[in-house]
Amino acid sequence: MNMAIIANGKIEKHARLRSIWANADARIAADGGAVNARQHLELAPHVLIGDLDSLDEATRRWCEQAQTEFLQHPRAKDQTDLELAIDLAIARGAKNISILGTLGGRFDQMLANVLLLIKPARANIPARIAGSDFDAWIATHSATITGNIGDTVSLIPLSERVEGIVTVNLKYPLHNETLYLGSARGVSNALTTIHAEVSFGRGLLMIVHLLESTEHS
C-alpha cells in the first residue's frame, strides 16, 4: 500500500506535492499537517494522528466532514507526531511511504524529521521525504535514481561508514569505496544519464536528489 504522510512543516502549493498526496492509497496527517493539507493540498487525510495541539477549528471541522479517523495522543509523550504517523503507516502495512512538510521551523525538529527515515529503512520499507524540488531517502544496500541529466545527487552516510560503494552513471564515480560519517565527500554529484545506480555492502546511506525545476500550479 502506497501511503503519504503530511507533517506540520513548511509546504507550498505545488502540483508535484498535490499529486503525491492525491495518488496515495492512504493519507495520514501528523497533527498540524492537516492544516497544511487543507490550505495547500485541498484533500483531507484519511487519518489524523497526534496530540492535536496544532489543529485549528476550521481544519477540525473540515476533517470531520471528510470522515477522517482521529487518533489523539496526550501532549506528554515520547514520540513526535510525525513519528507516530510513521509508526502507524508501518503498522497498517505500508509498502511505500512519502512524507511531505518536514522542513522549516525549528532546526531540532527538522533534523529529527529527516532522521526518522531510518525507521522505515530498517523495516525494509521504501520511504522518502518529498519536496517540490527534491527527494531524500535512505538506502540500505542499493538504489536507483531516475531524473534528468545534470540533476544533483548527494550521497550522505548516516552510519559510521558505508562500505563498498559502487556508482553507475554519476559524474564522479565511486568504485568499491567507503564514505564516512561526518565527511561531505559524497555531496554534489550529478546524473550523467536519466538513470543512475548506487550499491554498497554495508551501512545506511541517505540519497538526496535535487530535481530539475518544476512548475507551480
Language-model region placement:
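N-terminal beta-strand-loop-alpha-helix module at the start
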Residues: 1-62
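General beta-strand structural signal in soluble alpha/beta enzymes
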Residues: 6, 28-31, 50, 71-72, ...
